[in-house]
């Protein structure tokens, strides 16, 4: 079992450069080890990022003002770890897993060197043992369960225990705090272990026990353009790059509200503090459409905003994914929303510059692509020993400067994700929300989704490809019309253009502030998409471009009204009949 050394190494500061300190020490220090720097009776948390002989470079997670040459540094003997156990949900952490609500009680402003336990030690949890004396277990096996909200939170053999252990004692059912010993065990060498409800794990190491399996279940998010044009599977990875003001954060908030997953980890890494405040104000009052419970019951927030130290941005990303992996091991489906990975990459660039490493493109470190790949590879679906499956879906927002998708962070991300939802400034300016551009977005999961839906909807994949064809052709025809006008193109092209505009306006665009249209269930999407496919296949008889435009504008209005009606209500059914009758008045034949 991995344990913390009882002896601590000490050293002293010999050079300070911003939040990077050079420290000389006597003893043994590991890469990634946590250190504490003494400043005016406060101890500032830091991480070892480079070891050279008897000197190390450490990045401090707080303001290093007043740090002087000779300041005492103590090395803790353990890596930067996450504390995992009951009580993570409904909490708001910073990048070092301090509970911000507890810190707020002590002072209006965050004090330097003040840290609190990640899990409340006073809360009592109803514990039900599952293991019995004599059971032979390995890491990740269940010792018992507690009820956390409406989830069965599995208390597992710690992942730091790499040996088979035999249970020698189990606590009886009852209410206990997280630091209560709930089981004891012994390994083959006779070493004794005591297990509590809490375990710790280094955040930069993958937290997984079981077999990775191919993703095979659709993640319904209630956004038509995502579910249809750019689908994602549970356990998949996707990114949402876009310029300032394109709607990245609003889209991520929508995903956190309506995605068909069990747990949502919202990692606000370097974004504006106002957006985090909006989440904290809204979520407790919003209802999860899948369970009817408060959204906060399934949400954990790590809000390392741009006003916090740059060094903590990196730790917040890794903390978020470690918590997500922990819940995946319980057989739950988890969605991690990282907003934004560009701020994390900028933190890497800053630290790399202070380490005087050879820079890569745009001064980002040469290892940027491998760091981003390692982050996204921690996602995926996992089958546990008991046959249950859990998944971790990762969505990373990318904020390229000026909306330039050719910059290094976006390109490194595109090479490893399974779907790309590119947000367009032009669509946002035209108020075509969500502003995901279907012309540049893609998904590697489209064929798999078609196979999954084959029993329910025959030819789904081909129908989506046909819709993409109309979008591409309509876009090209629209560009020609800007030059030669409507009179300069044949009626067949005019028809294709109007069909593509109808599909964009009535299907791809969605009103996030409408109580009905904000979330479109998959069954409703299938019915609406079938209507769109029928319109694509239809042939119409128009004697002039004006008549064609008038007809499609009327059709747009009827379908848009239909989108605001409750699914399968009397108003919805009447609206659908009106649309079908209107189609039949101009339809000549069906291909």
Curated annotation (Swiss-Prot):
Keyword annotations: ATP synthesis, ATP-binding, Hydrogen ion transport, Ion transport, Nucleotide-binding, Translocase, Transport
Entry-linked Pfam families: ATP-synt_ab (PF00006), ATP-synt_ab_N (PF02874), ATP-synt_ab_Xtn (PF16886), ATP-synt_VA_C (PF22919)
Alphabetical list of PROSITE patterns matching this protein: ATPASE_ALPHA_BETA
Keyword ATP-binding: yes
Gene Ontology biological-process entries: proton motive force-driven plasma membrane ATP synthesis
CDD domains in alphabetical order: ATP-synt_F1_V1_A1_AB_FliI_N, ATP-synt_V_A-type_alpha_C, V_A-ATPase_A
UniProt-annotated binding residues for ATP: 242-249
GO molecular function: ATP binding; proton-transporting ATP synthase activity, rotational mechanism; proton-transporting ATPase activity, rotational mechanism
TM spans (from-to): none
Group of enzyme by EC: translocase
Reaction(s) catalysed by this chain's protein: ATP + H2O + 4 H(+)(in) = ADP + phosphate + 5 H(+)(out)
Keyword Transport: yes
EC id: 7.1.2.2
Protein family per UniProt: Belongs to the ATPase alpha/beta chains family.
Functional summary from the UniProt entry: Produces ATP from ADP in the presence of a proton gradient across the membrane. The V-type alpha chain is a catalytic subunit.
Protein known as: V-type ATP synthase alpha chain
Organism this protein belongs to: Chlamydia abortus (strain DSM 27085 / S26/3)
